Amino acid sequence: MRDGQPLWTCTGCGRTFANRNQTHSCAPLGSVDAHFAGCGPAVRETFDAVLAAVRACGPVDVLPERTRIALHVRMSFAAFMPRRRWLDGHLVLARRIDSPRFRRVEIYSPRNVLHAFRLMVPGEVDAEFTAYLAEAYLVGAQEHLRRGPGTR
């Protein structure tokens, strides 16, 4: 990746991407609030705690898509699917982490590893989880492409 390479903007939906003509579901974005209709208050509070932790890392775009809420810098690095009593989601990290915090790990490439999780209450957005969010934020900013695989 070249430093400062401009993002490509889709003329159909207005989303930005690191790669020109990036394949995506070109659809208008919805609202964050609509994703939480029918959810318990702890679900929204948990998402808000996650979002506050991510915003402490830097600017982030919140993309309320049809089936998920994605967090995006140069690329999407996290996604959330609110359920009635919990918040399902995943982070994209530049390395595999074997932790009971993650329900599933899928390796897409050596520097793009999906880690699925389920959060029940805002208190689970603790120092450990916040560190994972910060690491995922760097992936979203594509900082992981400036370093070797598996390094922070």
Placement of each model-derived feature along the sequence:
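Charge-dense, helix-prone N-terminal extensions
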Residues: 1-152
